[in-house]
Amino acid sequence: MELDVIFSRELHKKLKEKIKGKVFCRVFDDELYIRIDMDDLYFETSYENFVTRVCYGLSTDYVLYEVIEKYERFLINRVRKYYFKG
């Protein structure tokens, strides 16, 4: 198995432990794509230069932490838009 497949599978497993919804992780053209679908919400993020970043120490735990932070901000902004004016 190649490193990108192992990394994306491990990240998927860790994200599923923390997040409700459908989680999709994939490496394509040296870019790690992450998508989370829940109800009618769709969150996407990506990491460019995947191979170089892994060589310099990018770990699934670090990406997990960053994705959770971004996803939390995304959800908070959605709630604000739905419940508050302006």
Give the label of every model feature segment.
Residues 1-27, 58-69:
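Negatively charged, low-complexity tracts enriched in Asp/Glu with abundant Ser/Thr
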Residues 14-17, 23, 50, 78, ...:
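N-terminal cationic leader/targeting segments used for protein routing and processing
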Residues 13, 30, 48, 73-75:
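Coiled-coil-like amphipathic alpha-helices with heptad-repeat character
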Residues 35-66:
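Intrinsically disordered, low-complexity regulatory segments enriched in Ser/Thr/Pro
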Residues 25-34, 39:
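Short edge beta-strands and adjacent turn/loop segments
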Residues 57-86:
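Mixed-charge, Lys/Arg-enriched low-complexity segments
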